[in-house]
Every structure is written in C-alpha cells, then in structure tokens.
C-alpha cells in the first residue's frame, strides 16, 4: 500500500480540481497515439486514425480520452485503495484488450506533459509534479496488476 503525505494528498486533489478533464483527456490520448503510433492498434474501431490530422479530429479518440479521465477521477477519489479500485479495469486491459502495460506509462507521461503545458510552472511546480508523478505511478502499477 502506498503511503501519502498530507502534502501529496493536497497537491493531487488540488491539481485534479484545476484540470479540465474534457480538454486534457483528449489531448493526452491524441498525443499518445501520435508520438507512439504503435499504440493505435488498440483503437482500430475508432475509424480513421491514419494521419495526425485524422487523430486530432477524431471524436472517438476525444471521447475515450474523456473516459480515461473518468478512470483517473476514480483513482483520485480512492487514493488509499487505487489497486482495488482498478481491479476490473486491469482485468479488462490485460485479458480482453491485451494492452501492453508499458502503454499505461506512456499515457501517464502524456498526461503530465499536457497538464504541465496547460497549467504552467506556477501551478505545476516541482513539488506538485512530484506528487502527481507518484500518483500516476501508482495508477500505472494498478492497471498492470493483472499482468504479473
């Protein structure tokens, strides 16, 4: 189980409250699919994702990005039990979708980049980023739980 300091809890919840999930989710998933094109194979049902422009304009990509942010919200609300909160999601991604668990880490990086760009260094300072990265590492670990 992860130990959170009061400062980390506060940083994560405060940052989460400033994130526009309808904006950051689609941006992060779009970035993932463009920067790491091999991840596109999991989204073949989304229609045309053959070019960067197609990915940027694809509403199914945007919709799934918002869905993923809903999953992150679940983690924020369950900081003390993220692993169990993600059990079914981990099973789905490992047993049904067969997502390479390293893709979760790549998406977490994309989230951090998008949040940092959007909120800037005064909000997303080193202390906040440290707590956020720890949070995302726990989420990534929980999503990969069924792979071990």
Curated annotation (Swiss-Prot):
It holds the Pfam family Globin. The keyword Transport applies. Heme b binds at residues 64, 93. The keyword Secreted does not apply. GO terms for cellular component: blood microparticle; haptoglobin-hemoglobin complex; hemoglobin complex. CDD domains: Hb-beta-like. Residues 3-148 form the Globin domain. Keywords: Heme, Iron, Metal-binding, Oxygen transport, Transport. GO terms for biological process: hydrogen peroxide catabolic process. InterPro entries: Globin (IPR000971), Globin-like_sf (IPR009050), Globin/Proto (IPR012292), Hemoglobin_b (IPR002337), Hemoglobin_oxygen_transport (IPR050056). GO terms for molecular function: haptoglobin binding; heme binding; metal ion binding; organic acid binding; oxygen binding; oxygen carrier activity; peroxidase activity. It comes from the Eukaryota. Belongs to the globin family. Heterotetramer of two alpha chains and two beta chains. This is Hemoglobin subunit beta. It comes from Pagrus major (Red sea bream).
């Amino acid at each position: 189980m992860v130990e959170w300091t009061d400062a980390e809890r506060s940083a994560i919840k405060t940052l989460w409250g400033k994130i526009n999930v309808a904006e950051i989710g689609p941006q992060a998933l779009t970035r993932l699919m463009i920067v790491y094109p091999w991840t596109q194979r999991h989204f073949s049902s989304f229609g045309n994702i053959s070019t960067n422009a197609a990915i940027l304009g694809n509403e199914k990509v945007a919709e799934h990005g918002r869905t993923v942010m809903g999953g992150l919200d679940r983690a924020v609300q369950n900081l003390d039990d993220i692993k169990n909160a993600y059990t079914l999601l981990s099973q789905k991604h490992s047993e049904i979708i067969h997502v390479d668990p390293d893709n979760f880490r790549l998406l977490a990086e994309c989230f951090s980049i998008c949040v940092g760009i959007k909120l800037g260094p005064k909000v997303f300072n080193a202390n906040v980023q440290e707590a956020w990265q720890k949070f995302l590492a726990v989420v990534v670990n929980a999503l990969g739980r069924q792979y071990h």
